[in-house]
A protein has these predicted regions:
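Noncatalytic partner-interaction/assembly domains of nucleic-acid and motor enzyme complexes
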Residues: 1-116
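Short, surface-exposed linear patches
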Residues: 49, 131-132
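Short, well-ordered alpha-helical segments
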Residues: 119-124
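Short, conserved phosphate-binding/catalytic loop or strand-edge motifs used
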Residues: 125-130
Length: 132
């Protein structure tokens, strides 16, 4: 039985995600802040798979809730001291190239949420397997 459990766990090493959808949503918000409110009813920062995308979405949220514009220039201060493998200010400019229509960004938000739910189900399944 242990071998079967190992096989199941190996199949779940790559958790469900869609990085392209995450980039498109963030890029779209950075280009058109007006879509944030609708997207924020679907997803929050914890729904993103990529930890950097979680941080970026949180920073966008902070700026927009303060009534400020969220774009690569205004977000630069949030990430100047980040010690990540990527240059976040440059990444923010790059990710705006993935921006899409508001309608598509909303659909991509639903995909991000769906991937989050799937990851949570995988975690629950792994917990059940571990306690079995």
């Amino acid at each position: 039985m242990e071998n079967n459990l190992s096989i199941v766990k190996d199949n779940f090493k790559e958790l469900p995600n869609n990085i392209e959808a995450e980039q498109a949503v963030i890029g779209s918000i950075l280009v058109t802040n007006e879509i944030f409110d609708e997207i924020n009813t679907i997803i929050s920062n914890i729904n993103f798979y990529d930890p950097m995308h979680q941080k970026i979405f949180s920073a966008i949220e902070n700026l927009i809730y303060k009534g400020m514009l969220a774009n690569p220039i205004t977000l630069k201060n949030y990430f100047e001291n980040e010690k990540d493998e990527i240059n976040v200010p440059e990444y923010l400019v790059k990710v705006t190239k993935f921006s899409t229509s508001s309608r598509q960004a909303i659909e991509y938000s639903k995909i991000i949420y769906d991937m989050f739910v799937r990851r949570e189900l995988v975690k629950i399944s792994e917990n059940i397997i571990d306690t079995a």
